[in-house]
Amino acid sequence: MSDTLETAVHDDATTTPSTRREADEPDRNRRLLLFASTYGTLVFLGALMALFTVLSEIILGDQRFLTGANLSLVLRQSAVLAILAGGLTVVLLLGEFDLSIAASMTLGGAMFAQFAQGSYVFTWPSIPFTDIGGGAILGTSWQANAMFALFAALLFGLIVGLLNGLIVAQFGVTAFIATLGMAGIIDGYLVKLTDGRSVPLPAGVTDAAQGTVLGWKAPASWNWIVEPFGKTFEFNLVGLSIPSIALAAAAVLFVLWVFLNHTEAGRRMDAVGGNVEASRLAGINVRRYRMAAFVICAVVAALAGIVLAAGRTGSAVTLVGNQSSYLLQAFTACFLGAVSLREGEFHIVGTVIGVALMTVTFSGLIILGVPGYAQTIANGVILIAALTFAGIARRAAAAT
């Protein structure tokens, strides 16, 4: 008994505050590494905004990054990419990918413009060697309505998604081949339809799409001056507005978030992406949900094209190659999002963070006068750096 008591007293005496700190050190390091792997992208986003704010003052002599005009421009520029990447997230969540999203986006914008200006109408099929058929189904003036043009253009996206899903899910063709081939088909169709020329949109459509929410602008009181370390920084947010297309993007992303996180179909898609065989054994129709994912992706991509044409450029680009940069940007945003908040999982909130990171980077580089080729390089560097950092932090946390 006395030996046991003596041992306990000895052990307690040897457990000093310094040894307890040493024992807690691995846990503390592991928590820090887990935080870095989970929230590193958000921290990097905040650091970039601070960096561009400071560099703008130092290099340019005044604040051009954190201003109302520039933040409004960032919101406007990010809207199209956010919608496109949001739709792509659904496909990536299921372990597939879609290389036709830029083509679907181009198709959506082009068909919307064609319908809106009355250049394209749905007609009855004609019977050869007769005068039967060939007339407009709903009347030319009715089909030129902006709302009809919107739904008709989305219908083309729906058809593309159905074809992609059918080829991949039903016929077993790899998504790489199927969607790459579909992009070529869409490109050829648009060249045949428009001769590769841009299609202008009616002024009424562009005026509405390029406006701001309720016409609101930040008042004159939104102008702050801070003086840290004897240096004066002016943050002039006067004139900050919320573009209508930014609100549209937020609405689309919210619907996708609700669908994926709070509906039975969304949870089943998540299950299919996590383990296909287990989902099949659980009675989930894997083919149906894979097809649905491609349909959602293509329809949302077509909507992104409509937003781009109406809310940004005022006309629809009809050559897929002219918008191919959106393909890489959308994938980059999604993969950046996969290392944000949820480890290695594609999700809408993460995609939004990825889009914000990319748009802020491009905006800052443009303001600082960095050449266009360097901006493209930065796109790839950000993706590689973010994924590498997250992987290193994750492995270090597991080894701790």
Question: What name fits each language-model region?
Answer:
Residues 47-56, 68-122, 166-173, 331-349, ...:
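Single transmembrane alpha-helix segments in multi-pass membrane proteins
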Residues 44-63, 94, 193-194, 256-264, ...:
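Structural signal for alpha-helical transmembrane segments and their membrane-water exit/capping regions
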Residues 295, 301, 311-380:
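Transmembrane alpha-helical segments in multi-pass inner-membrane proteins
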Residues 122-183, 353:
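Alpha-helical transmembrane segments within multi-pass membrane transporters and channels
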Residues 61-73, 190-197, 237-240, 257-266, ...:
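Inter-helical junctions in multi-pass inner-membrane proteins, predominant
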Residues 128-141, 147, 179-262, 312-323, ...:
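Transmembrane helix-bundle core of multi-pass membrane transporters
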Residues 3-85, 120-148:
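Membrane-interfacial amphipathic/re-entrant helices at transmembrane-helix boundaries
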